[in-house]
Every structure is written in structure tokens, then in C-alpha cells.
């Protein structure tokens, strides 16, 4: 029976990975530009996003497996759950976790950079002329990637030799003591993942918090369309005004711009550039309006009008869900701040949950019927992931407040797609910590596990609470009953994350206080998004018009070449 249960749990995880592959593939194909696609870029992006999300979504499997050894109704271990079987389950989970974390680090620091340089090194003219071979391209990309290989090696070496914190005097317990029992290889990997998570937290704070606030509002508030009659009329008026001013300046100089003052010449040059922009904008808007008259577009807009109330409802539901998540994050953060026994010395670990956490309670109750908790947990993770994408799309990829790439559906370049994937990988690592340690700490540690709060009998049977159900209590990090320490099995994920924050208190302090910045920034962006009406991005519209004009010129040139 136990083998069948374990097999079913892993089967659900396999189905989840298949869904993740479909989600990642759809996401990448939807955002990449059709005219500049690279198979290597597409493949590495899909693999990276799938592996990262698979790492996060392993947590419910972890909870289900460690919880399967006990009966939550009786607070005792099942007959087959010997210590050897328990060790076998936790060891297999540990292997899977460390394998996934290793692949995550390799993809983030080596796989994506190499693919970026591999794409940049491609010279279409040289390749067609036979002057650039695959080996030359590989070596050129590898030389640039060596810098990231060096970073990875340095991280592992520092993590291998750096000492761990032992400053827990007066706060020792079996649970905390177990956090320090790891070998140096695990120590190095934990440190490396901690560094990447720290980098991801800065992105998580900026992009995920803003996206979490903006996503529901975007569904409830729709920006005006660039093909609307009012915009076309406004553009036509601006164009007429522009040309009238140009005629005035031409009349002033009789067609000879050399007779104009320097101020008037600058104004005329500016008017000419503005005229080109307005002409492209008008042509794009009129083309879009013409497309609206075709029957497929008419059907699409009618369906959009019919589904508009459901879109509003979805936005309202997502807003409630976001506030629900925000409340749970805030509650646990305050609980840890007030009740953690060792504070920053162990990463603000809680011995038990002291304040009611709604998300934590929902996940614990649903975990009694697997895979209900898996579905809820997956929806939460995908919601936060999509919020991160919305946040990045809103701000773009920036360096020192300078936008390098824009992220838009169907118009994202391969370079931007690789940078987007690396940012999402770092954000997902930070999300992994926030969900497991802050959003649902009790669920992520022990799940629905319980124990019978009776004094254990030495070398005798387990305590029986079948006639005293009031003595069946939920497992926690520190239970007063001695027998609970041997009965309650923490999840492997919580052990690894708590090892990270306990062995390296710097990580614990940064991870914890970053949550308050996240919560504050979410409220700020939410207030701004709700109070401000959506506007049409004219800069983005002008970029679309310029790209459309380039595509027309390329298509026209291609037809001339084919005709010749």
C-alpha cells in the first residue's frame, strides 16, 4: 500500500512537470519575436523555466511523502514506517533537491550566458560564405562564458571553506542541531544557492511586488486602443497642425532654410521628425482599423466584449487572492519578528506558529487529501510567476535605471528573452524561500503531521490517543513532548532552507527583512495602479509603427529581389 501511495505522489509530480513544460513553451513562444527566432535560445529558456518551477513545485511532493509515514488522525506512525523507510524517503528527496539546485545554478551561471554569447557570435553572412564554422562560434562563446564559470567556481570554493555560524547559545534544540549536520559539498551548494537567492530577492522585491499589484488592475482597467477613432482623429489633428507650422516657417524663408534663424531651423528639424513619427502612427492606426473590419477580427472583438464581465470578475478574484497572500506574508513576518527564539542568529526560525495564517491553514487542511494542496500550491506559484512577468514587462530590463530591453508579447528579442529567463530564475529562487518560509511555514515544514501528546513508553508501543483526541497536536519545530521529536519528520525543503539561513545568518537577515520591503512596495504600487487611469503608451506605439514600417520595407525589398 505504501509503495502505491509513494508511486502516485511521484506520478502527480510527473504530470506537473509535463504541465510546466507546456506552460514554459507557451510563454516563450508568445513573447519571442517571430522574425528573429533561435532554436537554441528557445530550448534553453524552456528548460530553465521548467527546471526552476519544478524545484519549487517539489515542495508539495516533499510534504506528501514525509506526511505519508504518519496517521494525522491518530498522531502516530504507520506500521510500515520504520526509521529505515523514513531515511530512505528523505534521502531520495535530498538527492532530487540537490540535483535540481545544481542544475539551476549551472543553467543560470553557465547555460544561459553561453547561449547568449552563442547567439551573439552568429554572423549570417560569414556562415553562408563558409567563413564561420560551428567550432569557431562555440569557442568564441565559450571564451566569454569562462568569466561566469570562474564566478561559479569561486562561489563553490567560498561556500566550501567558509565557517558556519554556531552562535546559538541558550537556544539549542534537536531541530536546530540537525540544521548543522551537512557535509562540505552540501555546504558549498547551499552557499551558492543563497547568493543567487539574495540576488533574486532584489528582483523579487521590485518586479514581483509591482506585478502582483498591477496584474489584477490590468484585467479590470483596459487601456485605450491605438486603433480607436478618437486616437486617429487626434493624430490627424496633430499632423495638420505640424504641417501648418512647417508651411509658416517655409513661407518665412521662401523655401531657403539657410535664411532662418538657428532657433527656427531647430524647430523645423523637430517638426520634420515629428511629422514622420505621426505619419507612421497614423498609418499603423488606420491599418489596425482596417483589420478590425475583417470578419475574424470582428468575431474576436465581439467575443472580447462578451467575455469582458468575466475579465472584470477574474481581476477582482485575483485582487482578493493577492490581498490574501499579502496578509499571510505580513502575519508570518510579524510572528517571526516577535516570537523567533534566536532572531537573526538562526534566520528568524519559528518554533511554532503563534498567529493564524490563512494560506498556511488552507494548505494544511487541503494536504490531508493529496493532491488538492498540490493544485492550490501550483496556482499560487504560477500566480506569483505571472506577476513577476507582468512586473518585468512594465518596467523592462534595466541597468542603473536605463532600459536595455523591452519585454512585450511577440516582440521580445532573443537576447532579451535570455535575460528575462535568467531574471525569472533568480526571482523563482527568492519565491521558493518566501513561499516555503514566510507564506506557509507550518505547511512547508510538517504539513498535516500530528503527534500523540502522551508520555512515550520506553521500548514499548507508540502512545495511543484514539480515545483522547484532544491530545493529538500538530507537529512543530519545538515540541515539549520528547516522543514528538522522533515522530515528526520535517520536510527536506524546510531543512535545506533553514540550513541556509542558520549556517549563514547574513542570508537569514537579508531574506527576512526583504519581506517587509516587498509588502510595503506592493501597497504603494497597488494604490498608484488603482487611482491612476490607464493610458496609451505613445512611445511604445511609435516603436510599433517604426517596426511595422521596417517590415514593409523588408517585404518590399524581398519581393523585388525575387522578381529580379
Swiss-Prot record:
The keyword Nucleotidyltransferase does not apply. The chain crosses the membrane at residues 8-28, 41-61, 94-114, 144-164, 188-208, 312-332, 375-395, 418-438, 506-526. The lineage of its organism: Eukaryota, Fungi, Dikarya, Ascomycota, Pezizomycotina. It comes from the Eukaryota. Keywords: Cobalamin, Cobalt, Lysosome, Membrane, Transmembrane, Transmembrane helix, Transport. It comes from Aspergillus clavatus (strain ATCC 1007 / CBS 513.65 / DSM 816 / NCTC 3887 / NRRL 1 / QM 1276 / 107). Belongs to the LIMR family. LMBRD1 subfamily. One of its GO terms (cellular component) is vacuolar membrane. This is Probable lysosomal cobalamin transporter. Pfam families: LMBR1. Probable lysosomal cobalamin transporter. Required to export cobalamin from lysosomes allowing its conversion to cofactors. One of its GO terms (biological process) is protein localization to vacuole. GO terms for molecular function: cobalamin binding. The keyword Amino-acid biosynthesis does not apply. It is found in: Lysosome membrane. Its main location: membrane. It is a multi-pass membrane protein.
Amino acid at each position: 500500500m505504501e509503495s502505491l501511495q509513494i508511486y502516485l505522489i511521484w506520478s502527480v509530480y510527473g504530470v506537473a512537470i509535463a504541465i510546466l513544460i507546456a506552460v514554459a513553451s507557451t510563454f516563450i513562444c508568445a513573447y519571442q519575436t517571430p522574425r528573429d527566432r533561435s532554436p537554441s535560445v528557445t530550448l534553453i529558456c524552456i528548460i530553465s523555466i521548467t527546471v526552476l518551477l519544478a524545484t519549487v513545485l517539489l515542495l508539495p511532493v516533499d510534504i506528501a511523502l514525509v506526511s505519508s509515514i504518519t496517521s494525522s488522525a491518530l498522531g502516530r506512525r504507520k506500521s510500515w514506517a520504520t526509521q529505515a523507510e523514513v531515511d530512505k524517503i528523505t534521502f531520495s528527496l535530498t538527492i532530487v533537491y540537490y540535483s535540481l539546485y545544481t542544475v539551476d545554478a549551472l543553467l543560470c551561471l553557465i547555460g544561459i550566458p553561453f547561449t547568449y554569447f552563442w547567439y551573439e557570435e552568429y554572423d549570417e553572412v560569414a556562415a553562408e560564405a563558409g567563413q564561420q564554422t560551428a567550432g569557431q562560434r562555440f569557442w568564441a562563446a565559450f571564451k566569454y562564458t569562462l568569466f561566469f564559470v570562474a564566478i561559479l567556481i569561486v562561489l563553490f570554493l567560498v561556500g566550501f571553506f567558509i565557517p558556519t555560524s554556531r552562535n546559538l547559545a541558550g537556544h539549542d534544540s534537536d531541530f536546530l542541531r540537525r540544521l548543522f549536520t551537512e557535509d562540505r559539498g552540501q555546504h558549498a551548494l547551499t552557499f551558492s544557492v543563497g547568493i543567487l537567492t539574495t540576488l533574486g530577492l532584489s528582483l523579487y522585491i521590485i518586479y514581483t511586488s509591482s506585478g502582483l499589484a498591477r496584474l489584477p488592475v490590468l484585467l479590470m482597467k483596459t487601456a485605450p486602443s491605438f486603433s480607436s477613432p478618437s486616437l486617429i482623429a487626434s493624430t490627424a489633428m496633430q499632423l495638420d497642425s505640424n504641417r501648418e507650422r512647417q508651411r509658416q516657417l517655409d513661407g518665412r524663408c521662401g523655401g531657403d532654410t539657410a535664411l532662418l534663424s538657428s532657433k527656427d531651423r531647430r524647430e523645423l528639424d523637430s517638426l520634420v521628425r515629428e511629422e514622420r513619427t505621426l505619419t507612421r502612427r497614423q498609418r499603423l492606426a488606420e491599418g489596425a482599423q482596417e483589420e478590425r473590419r475583417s470578419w475574424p477580427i470582428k468575431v474576436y472583438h465581439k467575443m472580447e466584449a462578451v467575455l469582458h464581465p468575466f475579465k472584470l470578475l477574474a481581476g477582482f478574484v485575483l485582487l482578493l487572492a493577492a490581498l490574501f497572500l499579502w496578509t499571510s506574508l505580513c502575519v508570518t513576518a510579524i510572528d517571526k519578528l516577535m516570537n523567533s527564539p534566536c532572531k537573526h542568529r538562526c534566520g528568524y526560525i519559528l518554533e511554532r506558529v503563534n498567529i493564524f495564517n490563512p494560506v498556511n491553514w488552507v494548505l494544511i487542511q487541503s494536504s490531508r487529501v493529496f493532491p488538492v494542496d498540490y493544485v492550490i500550491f501550483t496556482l499560487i506559484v504560477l500566480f506569483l510567476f505571472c506577476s513577476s512577468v507582468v512586473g518585468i514587462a512594465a518596467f523592462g530590463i534595466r541597468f542603473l535605471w536605463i532600459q536595455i530591453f523591452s519585454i512585450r508579447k511577440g516582440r521580445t528579442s532573443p537576447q532579451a528573452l535570455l535575460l528575462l529567463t535568467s531574471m525569472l530564475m533568480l526571482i523563482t529562487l527568492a519565491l521558493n524561500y518566501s513561499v516555503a518560509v514566510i507564506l506557509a511555514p507550518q505547511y512547508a515544514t510538517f504539513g498535516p503531521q500530528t503527534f500523540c501528546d502522551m508520555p512515550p513508553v520506553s521500548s514499548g508501543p507508540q502512545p495511543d490517543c484514539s480515545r483522547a483526541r484532544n491530545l493529538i497536536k500538530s507537529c512543530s519545530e519545538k515540541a515539549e513532548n520528547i516522543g514528538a521529536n522522533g515522530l515528526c519528520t520535517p520536510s527536506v525543503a524546510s531543512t535545506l532552507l533553514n540550513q541556509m539561513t542558520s549556517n549563514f545568518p547574513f542570508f537569514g537577515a537579508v531574506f527576512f527583512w526583504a519581506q517587509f520591503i516587498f509588502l510595503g512596495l506592493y501597497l504603494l504600487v497597488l494604490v498608484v495602479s488603482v487611482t491612476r487611469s490607464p493610458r496609451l503608451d505613445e512611445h511604445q506605439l511609435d516603436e510599433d509603427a517604426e517596426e511595422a514600417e521596417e517590415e514593409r520595407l523588408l517585404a518590399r525589398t524581398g519581393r523585388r529581389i525575387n522578381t529580379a
